[in-house]
Amino acid sequence: MSKSKILVGDVVKVIAGSHKGELGPITWISKDKKWVSVQGINSLKHVKPSQTDSEGGIKEVPSKINLSNVALQDPKNKDGISKVGYQIEDGKKVRIAKKSNSPLKKASK
């Protein structure tokens, strides 16, 4: 699989599924880069008890979303973007949205 341009902390827009149109920051990316977890979106409410966590009940546990169902949020025109480019500014490599040519905020963990 090709390298993903989405990083932990980036604000993404859900583009498919029951949460379509919702925004949130990424909290986790799987090692094989196929799944992401977005804060406040697609969370499980009912949790069954397991051997490690003997107490089940109603808890908010983040669930995963396929990477193909999210797009980076463009800071300038508030659309989901599909292409990320890079520019050198002051000797540093900066990520930009190719459509609006605006810099993407640095992802904070």
Swiss-Prot record:
GO terms for cellular component: ribonucleoprotein complex; ribosome. SUPFAM superfamilies: Translation proteins SH3-like domain. This is Large ribosomal subunit protein uL24. PROSITE patterns: RIBOSOMAL_L24. InterPro entries: KOW, Rib_uL2_dom2, Ribosomal_uL24, Ribosomal_uL24_CS, Ribosomal_uL24_KOW, Translation_prot_SH3-like_sf. The gene is rplX. GO terms for biological process: translation. The keyword Ribonucleoprotein applies. Keywords: Ribonucleoprotein, Ribosomal protein, RNA-binding, rRNA-binding. The lineage of its organism: Bacteria, Bacillati, Mycoplasmatota, Mollicutes, Entomoplasmatales. It comes from Mesoplasma florum (strain ATCC 33453 / NBRC 100688 / NCTC 11704 / L1). Part of the 50S ribosomal subunit.
